[in-house]
């Protein structure tokens, strides 16, 4: 089975793979975060259960296509991250997707509980998960990219400034109650 899809390019740095197109609204947050830092990504829908051979081939060929890490999002019996990690030496970051009868707890545990030797870094359920997956990938890339590291430093500073403004606002409202 050939690993071919529109918009695949050797120039992409991060692979984003989701088990279903219904995951895209959540996973797009990872893509948007990467794009905001100027990191290019390829995006695919590949099912660990319905297209296992394609998942394995995708992972086996990822490094040769220039990818530096893979972000894998799946819900339910979320084996996508594990299948990809079993077939590559690239870092794999798993995003468990909430849904179904267990509201994502099954996906969280399936992504998190990998056997020794097949690591999948796992992020949170919900909207923080894809953002943190992208930021984790960016942090890995920034180890050898000073410009990207500077963007991360600016991002962290902006987060701190946002908290300081929120603190000042709440304190002003609290003072008015006294």
Predicted features and spans:
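N-terminal amphipathic/basic-hydrophobic helices that include classical n-h-c signal peptides
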Residues: 1-10
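Glycine/charged-rich beta-loop-alpha catalytic/anionic-binding loops adjacent to active sites
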Residues: 12, 39-42, 89-90, 113-123
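Glycine-rich phosphate/diphosphate-binding loop of Rossmann-like nucleotide-binding domains
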Residues: 12-50
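C-terminal binding/interaction regions
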Residues: 18-25, 29, 105-178
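Short glycine/serine/threonine-rich phosphate/pyrophosphate-binding segments
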Residues: 23-27, 51-55, 74-83, 102-105, ...
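Acidic, glycine/proline-rich low-complexity segments that act as flexible tails and inter-domain linkers
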Residues: 25, 41-43, 53, 76, ...
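N-terminal beta-loop-helix "entrance" segment that forms/cooperates
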Residues: 43-64
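Glycine-rich phosphate-binding loop
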Residues: 58-100
């Amino acid at each position: 089975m050939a690993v071919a899809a529109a918009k695949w390019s050797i120039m992409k740095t991060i692979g984003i793979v989701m088990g279903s197109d219904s995951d895209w609204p959540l996973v797009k947050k990872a893509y948007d975060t990467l794009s905001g830092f100027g990191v290019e990504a390829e995006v695919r829908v590949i099912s660990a259960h319905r297209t296992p051979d394609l998942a394995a081939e995708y992972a086996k060929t990822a490094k040769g296509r220039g990818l530096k890490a893979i972000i894998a999002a799946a819900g339910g019996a979320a084996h996508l991250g594990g299948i990809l990690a079993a077939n590559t030496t690239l870092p794999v970051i798993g995003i468990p997707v909430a849904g179904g009868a267990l509201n994502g707890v099954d996906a969280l545990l399936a992504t998190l509980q990998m056997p020794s030797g097949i690591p999948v870094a796992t992020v949170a359920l919900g909207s923080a998960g894809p953002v943190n997956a992208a930021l984790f990938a960016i942090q890995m890339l920034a180890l050898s990219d000073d410009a990207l590291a500077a963007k991360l430093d600016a991002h962290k500073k902006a987060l701190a400034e946002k908290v300081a403004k929120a603190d000042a606002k709440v304190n002003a409202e609290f003072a008015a109650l006294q």
